[in-house]
Amino acid sequence: EDLHFLRNAREKAFKQNKILENSDLINDVFKREIASILRCDLSLIISEFEMNLLIEKFKIDENILFYLPLFGKVKNPETSFSERKNFISIGNFLHEPNWQTVLQLKKLWKDIKKQLPEAEIHIYGAYATEKVFQLHNEKEGFIIKGRAENVESVFSQAKVLVAPIPFGAGIKGKLLESMQFGLPN
């Protein structure tokens, strides 16, 4: 599990356009999360940064923490890399960092399109709202697809995963999963 207090603090700093300070980490979510860790016999931590933060900054006994990085087996994509096309981005739209990522992509896409006029980016994500679909623009090659019925197929056929995630915590599953398919990100 990623540390929610860290993600919340990063989100707040991002939205206020300020640099994250150590004092920003101390909030009600922090207190509940640290209390939960201290009540448990063992907490699994998937991020080396977060493991070090807990031990070094917050003096959590490393004997009640276990670093367990996410990993996965390499998968054989359906399509050879030379046959793949399009940029993709993927993420559930109920998760604020994923919505902010799409907004970042919309800003960046015009510059990418100038360099690669034939390029398209396909945006996948469950729970896409009307405001998400309003960003769809076929002329610009900015295509909102909505929910991916088969993520493996999407990753197997794409050329590059783009994920300018402005804030968050933990390890990004989409980055790890894309690597399993040999998809640069």
PLM regions with names:
Residues 25-26, 102, 144, 168:
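A conditional alpha-helix N-cap/helix-loop micro-motif detector
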Residues 19-26, 141, 162-165:
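Short, flexible loop segments at the rims of nucleotide/cofactor-binding pockets, characterized by
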Residues 2-27, 82, 92:
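Acceptor-binding helix/loop patch of EC 2.4 sugar-transfer enzymes
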